[in-house]
Amino acid sequence: MAAAMIWWPRFLLLLCLTCKGSTFYVPGVAPINFHQNDPVEIKAVKLTSSRTQLPYEYYSLPFCQPIKITYKAENLGEVLRGDRIVNTPFQVLMNSEKKCEVLCNQSNKPITLTVEQSRLVAERITEEYYVHLIADNLPVATRLELYSSNRDSDDKKKEKDVQFEHGYRLGFTDVNKIYLHNHLSFILYYHREDMEEDQEHTYRVVRFEVIPQSIRLEDLKTGEKSSCTLPEGANSLPQEIDPTKENQLYFTYSVHWEESDIKWASRWDTYLTMSDVQIHWFSIINSVVVVFFLSGILSMIIIRTLRKDIANYNKEDDIEDTMEESGWKLVHGDVFRPPQYPMILSSLLGSGIQLFCMILIVIFVAMLGMLSPSSRGALMTTACFLFMFMGVFGGFSAGRLYRTLKGHRWKKGAFCTATLYPGVVFGICFVLNCFIWGKHSSGAVPFPTMVALLCMWFGISLPLVYLGYYFGFRKQPYDNPVRTNQIPRQIPEQRWYMNRFVGILMAGILPFGAMFIELFFIFSAIWENQFYYLFGFLFLVFIILVVSCSQISIVMVYFQLCAEDYRWWWRNFLVSGGSAFYVLVYAIFYFVNKLDIVEFIPSLLYFGYTTLMVLSFWLLTGTIGFYAAYMFVRKIYAAVKID
């Protein structure tokens, strides 16, 4: 015990040092060196809104188009995220300034938006859509300068806090009028690479910013060869979009280059440090202290109580008194009695093992920086393939447990393991995808991708689950330390606090308390289009979650056995996943207080994906708690003498 107390602080220190470099990453692509006046291609990714949760491709709106539209070949993760990367008509040359340039200019005539196009643009603006562009694979960001008073200074000067917003707003509304950002001022930062004297200088793009502006048609002066002149100062009025009639306007842009000391390897730091790290650190450390303090108290109570019980029980002259005062030893002949529906239980636990292995590897690899943010969709692609290949471990654990529970139909059990949880996920996603298709969103998974996912499921995951299940079922079952009686013991009437739902509420508080702060950042990344790359923090929280779920599960099964209720298999699995109930409650709170979603389909998408998240989290935490409790039960009954 003393050795463990010495080891834990060292382990936490190591994890904290790992979290210190939580924004470290290994660049996923090789740097591109540009020479003077080399073209720097600007591509469009998609349009997003936190109000609708429906991404659209760039040319779903009447933007200016190049002569030939070319879409980038995308990986699985990009397709599932709704990315549709396409070229744009912006002409940008390395370290070459442009004061004002008109897009899709035909004989200096403005673009005319039809009534239908005007209504669509106005609708997207009122839905607060953002436009996402990339240059040299670097996403565009809008600089936000926030001012806060400095209390330490006597004159209380305002300090400027610079933050960045992903993408730029399509437009804005003011006094029931709708305005479009039709002029983009691009600011690109480059880093000059050190070269030998006889070689030409090369440049690398290290930041991509934009200042969106709305400029009325009458205030723009156009010249020859697509040039234009911007109005000076605040003399211009914004470009209004009237959804009830045709609108004429220009799409214009300007390019400004600035040299930067930021090196290419650190160019993503601007995007990955947008959250308040101090609050994040404080919350994480607070969770660590509280969780380990409470877990330590619970562990000490259980260990001391068990040591006393086992010592008394092993005294031959005191057996009768001990049997009367201690309940968990009275059910030794029934504690390993197989539960109802062992096939379903083992199948769910097998899927939980799949999830656990997948999540552990993904977080660990991302923490090491191997899933670079420049490799778009790499995280989701890796997670999908890992879940498929982890089927062999899920099948093995499910097969061995099923045999331990006296199961005989291993082929049916393997099929259940391979299809139960993935089938529910696929079914919900397919229904949601139909609604997304109906809205013509780029977030809809294309039919070929759907077929590819089915092929991965039945061509990779299912055979691997069968393979693992076969070897797991053939392996020697878990050795239970006591024999099971032929006649089941009568279970006494249970007190109210031993109710299953009460147990779920009690057991879920501690694991949820360990992760609810991190859950806020994850929800912000998913539903508000923010970057999330604090995988060092996430790995630490995951370890705390595993420890807290295990210890709470042990405490709950101990109290249940003390109440002479040996039906712990299903109950422990459900109770250990109790934190999923609090995740659901938090998701509802987040929906009501943080998001401005009012339409039916966005609400359906939110709660549909939330259902999948809660189900997966329940499987994960339930599996962790179940195996911890199973090891605990086998350990304590192996420590007592049974005649």
UniProtKB/Swiss-Prot annotation:
Q: List the InterPro entries.
A: EMP70 (IPR004240)
Which terms are listed as keywords in the entry?
Endosome, Golgi apparatus, Membrane, Phosphoprotein, Signal, Transmembrane, Transmembrane helix
> What positions are modified (Phosphotyrosine)?
Y313
Q: Which GO terms describe its cellular component?
A: early endosome; Golgi apparatus; membrane
Q: Which Pfam families match?
A: EMP70 (PF02990)
A biological process term (GO) from this entry: phagocytosis
Stated membrane topology is:
Multi-pass membrane protein
Which family does the record assign? Answer: Belongs to the nonaspanin (TM9SF) (TC 9.A.2) family.
Under PANTHER family, the record lists:
TRANSMEMBRANE 9 SUPERFAMILY MEMBER 4, TRANSMEMBRANE 9 SUPERFAMILY PROTEIN
The protein, known as: Transmembrane 9 superfamily member 4
The gene for this chain is Tm9sf4
